[in-house]
A protein has these predicted regions:
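Extended, loop-rich substrate-binding clefts of extracytoplasmic carbohydrate-active enzymes
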Residues: 7, 84-157
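Beta-strand-rich recognition/accessory modules
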Residues: 234-290
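Sec-dependent N-terminal signal peptides
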Residues: 3-13
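Extracellular/lumen-exposed scaffold segments
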Residues: 51-102, 203-219
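Beta-strand elements of well-folded, non-transmembrane domains
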Residues: 133-137, 149-153, 167-171, 193-197, ...
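Beta-strand-rich N-terminal accessory domains
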Residues: 16-84, 173, 179, 287
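Glycine-rich (often Gly-Gly/Gly-Pro-rich) flexible segments and glycine-rich loop motifs
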Residues: 180-228, 232
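Acidic (Asp/Glu-rich), glycine- and aromatic
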Residues: 43-46, 54-56, 154-202
Length: 290
């Protein structure tokens, strides 16, 4: 009896624990992260296009769906009102290089492509994903995009993600600009939210009754009820980022975007130079609410 208990104890102590985080490959160039068996997000590294959507809306290098710890899906992809919106994404409507103008936002004349399958690491403390992408325009690589994404364990009702994005022009300067529409400058790190009820948009602790553009904010979030589950997603740019605090594009229909480089009297674009990388960092927090 004592020997049996001893052997059982040894087996329990030496058994490899199940990892808290685990990535798994899905079809169509997608990587899913799970925490203790529950989905966290899907990173779409291969080209994605929904049936019935125009060909020029295909895209890659973005997160969707994104889940709360309780399983609420808070992001949307290919929404009918803005096919080009795509979960958590980073894109610019105006990309200029060598006298030509391309679109990395909607019509995708500058398209992000994956160089190789993303590298992943898993541990009880975090899970990380590193992806090397290139922006291709007219068959030429114009920007190298290095993505590092880190997910941390859920703490009660919340989970945090860190996104680090490094952009480098390849052989010629590339200028990034926001929207050319008057009074707007969307373009940068953005989130499109899933259909929901009870929408509340906040920025720096202020509830916004109306949509807002070009106002500098330290953070912004959108709260809503998703299939009966109330949740909120907040985006906080790193205060050390260039041009922080950012101007924002905030929409009650379900869009929150940190505009980089924004539009001011002295600045209306940012030029990437070959050999001089630009790094932008963001923290994304998803929280289940009572």
């Amino acid at each position: 009896m004592k020997l049996t208990l001893f052997l059982l104890t040894i087996c329990v102590l030496t058994a490899a624990p199940d990892p808290r985080f685990a990535f798994r490959e899905l079809d169509g160039g997608r990587l899913e992260l799970r925490e203790n068996g529950a989905p966290v997000f899907v990173y779409n590294y291969g080209p994605q296009l929904k049936l019935g959507v125009p060909e020029d809306r295909h895209r890659s290098s973005y997160l969707s769906p994104v889940y709360t710890p309780a399983g609420a899906i808070v992001t949307d992809d290919f929404p009918a009102d803005h096919y080009h919106h795509r979960g958590l994404f980073w894109a610019w409507p105006v990309v200029e290089t060598q006298g030509k103008v391309y679109d990395h936002w909607m019509n995708m004349t500058a398209l992000a492509r994956t160089v190789k399958t993303p590298a992943v690491q898993e541990s009880p403390q975090s899970a990380s994903l590193q992806a090397d992408n290139v922006w291709v325009a007219d068959g030429k690589e114009i920007v190298r995009e290095a993505l590092r994404l880190t997910a941390y364990p859920a703490q009660k009702d919340s989970r945090e993600l860190e996104v680090e994005l490094t952009l480098t022009a390849t052989s010629a300067p590339v200028t990034l600009r926001g929207s050319r529409e008057q009074g707007k400058s969307y373009g940068g790190f953005s989130a499109r939210f899933a259909p929901r009820q009870g929408t509340i948009v906040r920025a720096d602790g202020e509830v916004l009754i109306k949509d807002e553009d070009l106002v500098p904010r330290r953070w912004a979030e959108l709260e809503g009820i998703y299939n009966g589950k109330r949740a909120v997603l907040r985006i906080t740019p790193d205060p050390a980022d260039l041009n922080a605090p950012y101007q924002w594009c905030l929409r009650n229909y379900g869009f929150v975007g940190a505009s980089f480089p924004g539009r001011t009297a002295s600045s209306d674009g940012y030029t990437l130079e070959p050999g001089k990388p630009l790094t932008l960092k963001f923290r994304v927090k998803v929280t289940d609410l009572p």
